[in-house]
UniProtKB/Swiss-Prot annotation:
Pfam family, one: Mg_chelatase
SUPFAM superfamilies referenced in this protein's UniProt entry, alphabetically: P-loop containing nucleoside triphosphate hydrolases, Ribosomal protein S5 domain 2-like
Protein name: Uncharacterized protein Rv2897c
InterPro entries: AAA+_ATPase (IPR003593), CHLI-like (IPR045006), Mg_chelat-rel (IPR004482), Mg_chelat-rel_C (IPR025158), Mg_chelatse_chII-like_cat_dom (IPR000523), P-loop_NTPase (IPR027417), Ribosomal_Su5_D2-typ_SF (IPR020568), Ribsml_uS5_D2-typ_fold_subgr (IPR014721)
GO CC annotation: plasma membrane
SMART domains: AAA
Further information: Was identified as a high-confidence drug target.
Species of provenance: Mycobacterium tuberculosis (strain ATCC 25618 / H37Rv)
Family in the record: Belongs to the Mg-chelatase subunits D/I family. ComM subfamily.
Gene3D superfamilies: 3.30.230.10, P-loop containing nucleotide triphosphate hydrolases
NCBIfam families cross-referenced by the UniProt entry: YifB family Mg chelatase-like AAA ATPase (TIGR00368)
GO terms assigned for molecular function: ATP binding; ATP hydrolysis activity
């Protein structure tokens, strides 16, 4: 009887759990038996591992081979366990165990000739290894830049199974940590490219200052998409912990770039209007993968032609908008992904959407039904609503509007003021502040609250609408450099909740 052991990581959502892999060689009919809740891809690893081991010049045990993955109750999915399985088999055939194998986590898929292929989810796996106190992790060489983002743990890159075997014996070394660029390239989109639309430009600035949700309505070609694409450029760069969190989500989704794996700027995600519920919030067979709402975490989720999106997909946005996370239950377990994003909706006023509203041929009932797909509870969560109109010839002037860098400076000052004010209460932006805190400890003056009381008495606002209006009023005050919102800021914030209102 011979026993070998290796270790790997199972990633569920953004959490990783250490998996112990044991290889037991006993007398009996030759065959490979894999136990421990493996999925189809892991079942196929028996053939990949056997071919890789033999093609690297090693013998395969002609006896009964049992491969056990523990804990047995945890579902194991994917090909990330290949090199750990191969190392356990090779260790079982050795007379003397490899000391390095007991202190190293192994991640990677094997090809038939022994090459190590890249896998998804390396960053959350390495973070889990560091959390549990493991001294070293070996990853595919193509994933080494991603693994090198985690400090405080020894990361190594391997290209072939033979190279890994030599390193375990202590005869050769493996590639070490790689230093990569720590910045994401700036977007070339500039706010100065947008012609006219001063009201909508100001709404985008307010949205950036307070992390508010925004809805733009208007005919085609007025600049709704251009404005939405320029919102991420106004937002501050991600902090170190935020960068790792966002990068981990994109790692699980398989969307990381090999050259600049660390995401330092807020992401911009724009799914197609025909996207399904699973594409928006996440899903898939086996363990659920992150959807658009999670990929937009700490960034902007832009839903163009939102009136064309299915009702079920729109209603699925309610939970992440309120909770800042999405929990996806599947047969193999529950995956939880963060989903705290800024939502930007864009819609035409009607199905025909002419450039001139006077040319519209839609009946009044058709118009109501078209935008009626956006439910009241969903719209109530949108703080800023702007009606955009087609430009006249006078809007084309030689002078450009303010650039992204100019507006970003004002946004940064407003965000810093908000962060200092809310830091003792555990918040950073105005959009995150709870309603009771706004209405009790940070309530504006009685005169400033007059427009809100009037709207509430007339049934134009819900209590949630009052809270969201106050949040926008605080953002307007921060942009103006004031210590508290006055009646002008409250009235302006209230006007942003009324479709067609002007600044």
């Amino acid at each position: 009887m011979a026993l070998g052991r290796a270790f790997s990581v199972a990633v569920r959502g953004l959490d990783g759990e250490i998996v112990e892999i044991e290889a037991d060689i006993t007398s009996g009919l030759p065959g490979v038996h894999l136990v421990g809740l493996p999925d189809a891809a892991l079942q196929e690893s028996r053939d990949r591992v056997r071919a890789a081991v033999t093609n690297c010049g090693n013998s395969w045990p002609m006896a009964r081979l049992t491969l056990a993955l523990s804990p047995a109750t945890l579902p194991k999915m994917g090909s990330v366990y290949d090199i750990a399985l191969a190392a356990a088999v090779l260790s079982a055939q050795q007379k003397k165990p490899w000391e390095r194998l007991e202190n190293t986590l192994l991640l990677g898929e094997l090809s038939l000739d022994g090459r190590v292929r890249p896998v998804r989810g390396v960053l959350p796996a390495v973070l889990a290894a560091k959390r549990d106190g493991w001294p070293a992790v070996v990853v595919p060489a193509d994933n080494l830049p991603e693994a090198s983002l985690v400090d405080g743990i020894d990361v190594r890159g391997v290209r072939t199974l033979g190279q890994l075997q030599s390193w375990l014996r202590g005869s050769t070394g493996l590639a070490g940590r790689i230093t990569t660029a720590d910045t994401t390239p700036e977007s070339a989109a500039d706010l100065a490219d947008v012609v006219g639309q001063s009201q909508a430009r100001f709404a985008v600035e307010v949205a950036a200052a307070g992390a508010h949700h925004l809805m733009l309505t208007g005919p085609p070609g007025v600049g709704k998409t251009m404005l939405a694409q320029r919102l991420p450029g106004l937002l501050p760069s991600l902090s170190g912990s935020e960068s790792l969190e966002v990068t981990a989500i994109h790692s699980v989704a398989g969307l990381l770039s090999g050259d600049t794996p660390l995401i330092t700027r807020p992401p911009f995600v724009a799914p197609h209007h025909s996207s399904s519920v699973a594409a928006l919030v996440g899903g898939g067979s086996g363990m659920a993968r992150p959807g658009a709402v999670s990929r937009a975490h700490r960034g902007v989720l832009f839903l163009d032609e939102c009136a064309e999106i299915s009702l079920s997909a729109l209603e699925a946005l309610r939970t992440p908008l309120e909770d800042g996370e999405i929990r996806l239950a599947r047969r193999d377990g529950v995956a939880c992904y963060p989903a705290r994003f800024q939502l930007v909706l864009a819609a035409n006023p009607c199905p025909c959407a002419p450039a001139d509203p006077q040319d519209c041929i839609c009946a009044a009932a058709t118009k109501r039904r078209y935008l009626g797909k956006l439910s009241g509870p969903l719209l109530d969560r949108v703080d800023l609503r702007v009606q955009m109109h087609r430009l006249r010839a006078g809007a084309f002037s030689a002078a450009d509007g303010e650039s992204t860098s100019q507006v970003r400076q004002r946004v940064a000052l407003a965000r810093e003021a908000a962060a200092q004010r809310w830091r003792p209460h555990g918040f950073r932006t105005n959009a995150e502040v709870s309603g009771p805190l706004l209405r009790r400890k940070f309530r504006p003056s009685s005169a400033a609250m007059l427009p809100l009381r009037t709207a509430l008495d007339r049934g134009l606002l819900s209590i949630r609408g009052v809270d969201r209006t106050l949040r926008v009023a605080w953002s307007l005050a921060d942009l103006a450099g004031r210590t508290s919102p006055g009646i002008d800021e409250v009235a302006a914030a209230l006007s942003f909740r009324q479709t067609g209102a002007r600044r």
